[in-house]
Amino acid sequence: MEAPYSMTAHYDEFQEVKYVSRCGTGGARGTSLPPGFPRGSGRSASGSRSGLPRWNRREVCLLSGLVFAAGLCAILAAMLALKYLGPGAAGGGGACPEGCPERKAFARAARFLSANLDASIDPCQDFYSFACGGWLRRHAIPDDKLTYGTIAAIGEQNEERLRRLLARPTGGPGGAAQRKVRAFFRSCLDMREIERLGPRPMLEVIEDCGGWDLGGAADRPGAARWDLNRLLYKAQGVYSAAALFSLTVSLDDRNSSRYVIRIDQDGLTLPERTLYLAQDEESEKILAAYRVFMQRLLRLLGADAVEQKAQEILQLEQRLANISVSEYDDLRRDVSSAYNKVTLGQLQKIIPHLQWKWLLDQIFQEDFSEEEEVVLLATDYMQQVSQLIRSTPRRILHNYLVWRVVVVLSEHLSSPFREALHELAKEMEGNDKPQELARVCLGQANRHFGMALGALFVHEHFSAASKAKVQQLVEDIKYILGQRLEELDWMDAQTKAAARAKLQYMMVMVGYPDFLLKPEAVDKEYEFEVHEKTYFKNILNSIRFSIQLSVKKIRQEVDKSSWLLPPQALNAYYLPNKNQMVFPAGILQPTLYDPDFPQSLNYGGIGTIIGHELTHGYDDWGGQYDRSGNLLHWWTETSYSHFLRKAECIVRLYDNFTVYNQRVNGKHTLGENIADMGGLKLAYYAYQKWVREHGPEHPLHRLKYTHNQLFFIAFAQNWCIKRRSQSIYLQVLTDKHAPEHYRVLGSVSQFEEFGRAFHCPKDSPMNPVHKCSVW
């Protein structure tokens, strides 16, 4: 779904040299020999006839031709030997001089692959450990990180590039936005000024919200004037803090040509509702740590009766958790069932304890009519929220809303607040050491000036040539999906036609949005003040301007070419309500993609990610949307029932995987597992198409593996990763992706071409007889 704006090989081909022999009926004059051939002392045609009888001239000519042919064969053999066996073989053969880009890239690729492998492990028993065992042995998780993997290493490279760009002087070419992002970055680094201010910036925000306990006893000053709607406006419309529910502007799922206001369940601080329910020892520990965190922040902000306040706010959040529905519940995954478009007048009747027209008028600076339509995505939840408002003391409601604002902004305060946040994160996820300040500030620059920073990034680190090559790779993989659709035996003709139409209409965005090349267009995204000495105020200015941009969209025409993430993002995504795939420049970097790598590695690396995102258009979530991005059931009942049966096979497969005594939830991870499996197949068959069109690739120097095997190794090495044990608990609980080990094993074991490439015996762990397959 689209979020509100305010809130992420080529070779030197063998050149055949055609040498022309002029030996013929006219004699041997002018014979041309390739360079390096020794030239004989042959006699001229005018020599003594007695030394060269007439009948032997043909023999001499024939002999010369044979000598020439033998010499030519010797040269060709030498060239091929250099190409295939010499140190430059991986780089395109003997024609590639020492130090040429292809040779260096191939050598780098070979070193990377071989260092990550553990050849002592049978790939047919545990392909992940075979492909990643060497990497796992050699790497530890940095103290300030929860995880570390091969993709994270690309992120480190991108971060270093961004830091260097931000460290440059503010002057020079570029628009105001580039100067602002550098000033913002410096303001974030200025901890001396941040420490000097201490809690003061947050205390001013709390005062703006009415202070603590304003909704208390009637004899308190201001108690009679307390208005929940005004405080909700402050929280949601000024500070962008979701409280009780969320208000966003997004594409209308049933009419993606227009924007609509969406109201949904929200307002919890912890990342998953079940953490509030303390159903196991780990969630009990996290809940206890959260209570300590609340008390610590409340004390830092001068609140009284800290334990009581913390307990009351926590109990209110627990009530919200009890009436919320998990994001992985069938009720949430079925978008059509959740979608409920109502008028403002109807909304007021459904949820009567809020003044909806007044609230939306204030946030959107509009005068909405009672007939204005909004989309309610959690009708039952919102009805229960209305009852919760009625039954909860005003003082507790007020403190909860103020707390939600505090949680959103406290990371931008002085060291005591940051230390409290780190202690909570340490208990939840296990990171021992806080992130270094420069990384924190780079993250904030990405969040608040993503496109401005992206303009700097793509100018120096992503070429138009790379963009064109990746676009061609995407088209090859799309072509394969079109073929696969035709070959499916479980999908009828009517559904195939709709699936092909969706593929044809799918938009593909690669690298960066074109407006980044125009400084004045980038400047319009950041028309707010930034000063080097006012970091907290810079944050507030950014939040308020982002809200303005978001609310203005409600009356604007939809631009389906807009991007959700900036180009430096180390990510890729598919948006079903736009039918749009996006591959930012940040992920199109070595080792996922390198134009000089063998194509087996590019298709196994970035190609499987492209196939993954493409398959999302046809998984259990994306498959609910049609070619225009509208929520519309385009399947026949017969085809859809076949799809569900095939999907259930994948659910059962992943339900059998466990990590740290936690069972992977096959239903939670279904969409990502379908995409992993489908993406692997599409990329593999696209690579086979490339080989048919360009010819087999040359062996990678000093590696004994075929390029089909290297394709699968590259895929697996995308997901070489280490996680802290505490973070695995949250991953299994909240992540829609299966743990990386099982992303690899689940995908390759269900693909017959993998077993064929590695000669895996039938019914070995990586080549079971019965396989799950959708696409």
From Swiss-Prot:
Cofactor: Zn(2+)
Domain Peptidase M13, residue spans: 99-775
Region: Disordered, residue numbers: 30-52
Disulfide bonds: C124-C760, C132-C720, C188-C441, C649-C772
Phenotype of null mutants: According to a report, mice die of respiratory failure shortly after birth. According to a second report, mice exhibit perturbed terminal branching of motor neurons to the endplate of skeletal muscles, resulting in poor formation of the neuromuscular junction.
GO molecular function: metal ion binding; metalloendopeptidase activity
Keyword NADP appears in the UniProt entry: no
Protein name: Endothelin-converting enzyme-like 1
